[in-house]
Amino acid sequence: MGQSQSQIFEDLISNSSFSNEEIERIRKRFIKIDANQSGSIDRNEFLSIPSVASNPLASRLFSVVDEDGGGDVDFQEFINSLSVFSVHGNKEEKLKFAFKIYDIDRDGYISNGELYLVLKMMVGTNLREDQLQQIVDKTIMEVDKDRDGKISFEEFKDIVSGSNVTSSMTLDSF
């Protein structure tokens, strides 16, 4: 038999950085986003969130938030992702989330092709393909310390942790 609603709620509180009140506000927001009232947020519903819709990486965000790859985001996945962006979310969690944006095949590495695809989403048609490929190749050469042709999480963390990326991944309130 499954867990009771109160047990699920208690688990959400203990496994996230949110208070009771914040989880309740997030639950109400989740219900509003879930337009077809299926109990989960599908890709189209997710992409209809105004702050997400305007992001060039919206489809990648959905893929990362959809932790199990099931094609929709349940409330647990929603809370887990928002927890990363809370003021209480730690730097390591934020960096792992950012890394997953680039790690399209979820193999724990960012390949040349994955970096190219994600950067292409960000720059659109502002760069020629050969210019973008040069940037990707140069980035891989500079970041790939063990010379295996791909970027591991540790290599990513080394290069990104000196920036303010994690502070821009923090939302003040929910």
Curated annotation (Swiss-Prot):
Q: Which SUPFAM superfamilies match?
A: EF-hand
Q: Name one GO cellular component term.
A: calcineurin complex
- Report residues binding Ca(2+) 3: 103, 105, 107, 109, 114
**Quick check: keyword Repeat in the entry?**
yes
Gene Ontology MF, one: phosphatase binding
**The keyword Hydrolase belongs to this UniProt entry's keyword annotation:** no
Give the matching SMART domains. EFh (SM00054)
**At which positions is Ca(2+) 1 bound?**
34, 36, 38, 40, 45
Q: Where does Ca(2+) 4 bind?
A: 144, 146, 148, 150, 155
- One Pfam family name from the record? EF-hand_7
- Misc remark for this entry? This protein has four functional calcium-binding sites.
| Protein name in the entry | Calcineurin subunit B
The major lineage groups are:
Eukaryota, Fungi, Dikarya, Ascomycota, Taphrinomycotina
Q: Encoded by which gene?
A: cnb1
